[in-house]
C-alpha cells in the first residue's frame, strides 16, 4: 500500500462508508480539502480488493489505538491529518481546530457573566482589545456590555467592530498576553469574525437611542461604512415592506401578546399589514386589544420589537422569510 498517498487512502475510505456518511465528513473539511478529495475521487477508475482491505485494516488499527486510554489525542489527530492531507494542510487545519477549542471556555465564561461584571472586566483595556473580545461573544451579550460603556468608548469600540478584519499576527502576542489575564489563560483565535454584519447585529440589539447615536458616530467617521451597516440592519418598521407570505410565516412564530405590545409603538400602515394577514377572528381580537390596552412603556415596546426582529432574522437565514431585495436601503 506504499504507493497510496494519504489523499488516496482518504478517498477509498470515503467511497467505502457510503454517500451520506461521506457527506457528513465533507461538512467538517475546508473548501480546499473538499476540492482536493473531490478531484482525487473523480480520477478513481478502479480500486483493487487488496487496496480496499489494506485501507480498512489500517483505519481499524488506528481507530483501536485511539480508543486506548493512554492515547494522546492531539498527537493522534496530527498524525491522521498529516497522512490524509499532507504536512502543510494538516498543520493549518490542526491550528484552527485547537485554537477554536481553546477559545471556547474563555469566551463562554464571558457569555455567562452578568453584563455589568463583564463590562467592568474589560472596560479599561484598549478599545481594539475590547472590540476583538466582543466580536466573539453572543450578539445580545455584546450589546448589553456595550450599553454599559460611556458613549465615547461605545462609539470607538463599535467603529472598530465594523472595520474589524481579524487579529493580525503582529498583534497576536500582545492580545494573547492581555487575554491570558482576563480570560483565565484562554486565547482568542485569529478569526474573520467582526465587520459590518457583526456591527449591524449588535446595534440591532441596542436601545433605539443608542442605535441612533452609534450610527451617527460611525457616519461622522465614514459615511459609506455607516450606510453599509444600515443596509445590514433590519428595523421593525421595515416589516411594512415585507411580502404577505413572509408576514404570515412570521405570525406562526410570534406570541400574540408580544405582537400586541410591539404594535403599540407602530404606525398604522404596519399594524394593518399584520391585521390583513390574520384570520378575521384573530384580526378583530388584535384590533380590540390595541384599542383597549392602556399605555405601554416605550422600553417594553422596543424589547418586544427586537425579540420579533430576532425571529425575522432567523427565518430570513433559513429562507423562510424574504426581508429585502438587496437593493433596499433601511434608514
Curated annotation (Swiss-Prot):
Cell location: Cell inner membrane; Bacterial flagellum basal body
One function term, GO molecular function aspect: identical protein binding
Subunit field text: Forms dimers and other homooligomers. Interacts with MotA via residues in its C-terminus. Interacts with flagellar brake protein YcgR.
Gene: fliG
InterPro entries found in the cross-reference section: Flg_Motor_Flig, Flg_Motor_Flig_C, FliG_a-hlx, FliG_M, FliG_N
GO biological process per UniProt: bacterial-type flagellum assembly; bacterial-type flagellum-dependent cell motility; bacterial-type flagellum-dependent swimming motility; chemotaxis
SUPFAM superfamilies linked: FliG
The protein's name in its UniProt record: Flagellar motor switch protein FliG
Function as written in the Swiss-Prot or TrEMBL entry: FliG is one of three proteins (FliG, FliN, FliM) that forms the rotor-mounted switch complex (C ring), located at the base of the basal body. This complex interacts with the CheY and CheZ chemotaxis proteins, in addition to contacting components of the motor that determine the direction of flagellar rotation.
Keyword Endoplasmic reticulum: no
Superkingdom: Bacteria
Family, as annotated: Belongs to the FliG family.
Motif Part of the EHPQR-motif boundaries: 125-128
Protein source organism: Escherichia coli (strain K12)
GO cellular component: bacterial-type flagellum; bacterial-type flagellum basal body, C ring; bacterial-type flagellum rotor complex; plasma membrane
Keywords: Bacterial flagellum, Cell inner membrane, Cell membrane, Chemotaxis, Flagellar rotation, Membrane
Record bears the keyword Membrane: yes
Residues the UniProt record annotates as site (Part of the EHPQR-motif): 160
Mode of membrane association: Peripheral membrane protein
Amino acid at each position: 500500500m506504499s504507493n497510496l498517498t494519504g489523499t488516496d487512502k482518504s478517498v477509498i475510505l470515503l467511497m467505502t462508508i457510503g454517500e451520506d456518511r461521506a457527506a457528513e465528513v465533507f461538512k467538517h473539511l475546508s473548501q480546499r480539502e473538499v476540492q482536493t478529495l473531490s478531484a482525487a475521487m473523480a480520477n478513481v477508475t478502479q480500486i483493487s480488493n487488496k487496496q480496499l482491505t489494506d485501507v480498512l485494516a489500517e483505519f481499524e488499527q488506528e481507530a483501536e489505538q485511539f480508543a486506548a486510554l493512554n492515547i494522546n489525542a492531539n498527537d493522534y489527530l496530527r498524525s491522521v491529518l498529516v497522512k490524509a492531507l499532507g504536512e502543510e494542510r494538516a498543520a493549518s487545519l490542526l491550528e484552527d481546530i485547537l485554537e477554536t477549542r481553546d477559545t471556547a471556555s474563555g469566551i463562554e465564561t464571558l457569555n455567562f457573566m452578568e453584563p455589568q461584571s463583564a463590562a467592568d472586566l474589560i472596560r479599561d483595556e484598549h478599545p481594539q482589545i475590547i472590540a476583538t473580545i466582543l466580536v466573539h461573544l453572543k450578539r445580545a451579550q455584546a450589546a448589553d456590555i456595550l450599553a454599559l460603556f460611556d458613549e465615547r468608548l461605545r462609539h470607538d469600540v463599535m467603529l472598530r467592530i465594523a472595520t474589524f478584519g481579524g487579529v493580525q499576527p503582529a498583534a497576536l502576542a500582545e492580545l494573547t498576553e492581555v487575554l491570558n489575564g482576563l480570560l483565565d489563560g484562554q486565547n482568542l483565535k485569529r478569526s474573520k469574525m467582526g465587520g459590518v454584519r457583526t456591527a449591524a447585529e449588535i446595534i440591532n440589539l441596542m436601545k433605539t437611542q443608542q442605535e441612533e447615536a452609534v450610527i451617527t458616530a460611525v457616519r461622522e467617521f465614514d459615511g459609506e461604512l455607516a450606510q453599509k451597516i444600515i443596509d445590514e440592519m433590519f428595523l421593525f418598521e421595515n416589516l411594512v415592506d415585507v411580502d404577505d407570505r413572509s408576514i404570515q410565516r412570521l405570525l406562526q412564530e410570534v406570541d400574540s401578546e408580544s405582537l400586541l405590545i410591539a404594535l403599540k409603538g407602530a404606525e398604522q400602515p404596519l399594524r394593518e399589514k399584520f391585521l390583513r394577514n390574520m384570520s378575521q377572528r384573530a384580526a378583530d381580537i388584535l384590533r380590540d386589544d390595541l384599542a383597549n390596552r392602556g399605555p405601554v412603556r416605550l422600553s417594553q415596546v422596543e424589547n418586544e420589537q427586537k425579540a420579533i426582529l430576532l425571529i425575522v432574522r432567523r427565518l430570513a437565514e433559513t429562507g423562510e422569510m424574504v426581508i429585502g431585495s438587496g437593493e433596499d436601503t433601511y434608514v
